[in-house]
A protein has these predicted regions:
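Terminal non-domain segments
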Residues: 1-97
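Generic detector of low-complexity/intrinsically disordered segments
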Residues: 14, 18, 37, 44, ...
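N-terminal domain-start segments of secreted/luminal proteins
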Residues: 76-136
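Solvent-exposed loop/turn tips at the surfaces of repeat/solenoid architectures
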Residues: 102, 119-127, 140, 145-152, ...
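Long terminal segments
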Residues: 173-199
Length: 199
């Protein structure tokens, strides 16, 4: 029985890799019309731990970067791609705590009132950061963290994520900071993300 399951698993991986190759060569119209299929293929490929050739993965990434639409289907498929790119998630990480200690300075160089965000960065490591729980993150860095995001309201400024795992579950059109973060992940092959200070 075990041998049969391994054989079925092998066939499934081959099938899913072929589906990923097909998605990588979609025309813009096919990609737009097939977003739910793209999401399903990428979700299944992650679950089955399919390792597609780098040129296939890059071809699918390019589809997302090239195709700029703002629909729930697009962001759901984008979440599936980001999750596919991330390695398996380690269990038992505690929540990041340093993110709550980040300060925002309220002044302008000319003496007028206003909001200038601190350029100092507080760092954390090896923890879980749920972006939806914080809404605004300023001057924060995280190394080898799990970064979760479900598409809620979000403001990011002077933020660095280094060697992190990303878990996205976006089901609707996401705010600007969420879009920026998703695009950075899709275009950056290292997984190191830097969001500059916003004034």
């Amino acid at each position: 029985m075990n041998g049969k399951m391994e054989e079925i698993s092998g066939f499934l991986k081959i099938f899913l890799e072929n589906q990923m190759k097909r998605v990588a060569t979609f025309s813009p119209r096919e990609f737009q019309d097939g977003l739910s299929e793209v999401k399903a293929v990428l979700g299944a490929a992650r679950s089955a731990q399919v390792t597609a050739p780098p040129q296939v993965v890059q071809g699918i990434r390019a589809q997302f970067v090239r195709f700029k639409v703002d629909t729930p289907e697009y962001w759901g498929a984008t979440s599936a791609m980001i999750n596919y790119l991330s390695p398996p998630v380690p269990q038992g990480l505690s929540k990041c705590t340093s993110v709550d200690k980040v300060a925002v300075q309220l002044y302008k160089p000319d003496g007028s009132t206003g909001r200038i965000l601190s350029t100092d960065t507080t760092r954390d490591s090896g923890c879980l950061l749920d972006l939806d729980e914080h809404k605004t993150i300023v001057g924060f860095g995280c190394n080898r963290c799990i970064i979760k995001y479900s598409g809620g309201q979000l403001t990011l400024s002077n933020v660095e994520f280094t060697d992190c795992i990303y878990i996205f579950a976006i089901t609707s059109v996401t705010p600007c900071a969420g879009k920026l973060l998703a695009r950075e992940i899709l275009t950056n092959r290292t997984g190191d993300i830097m969001i500059p200070p916003v004034e």
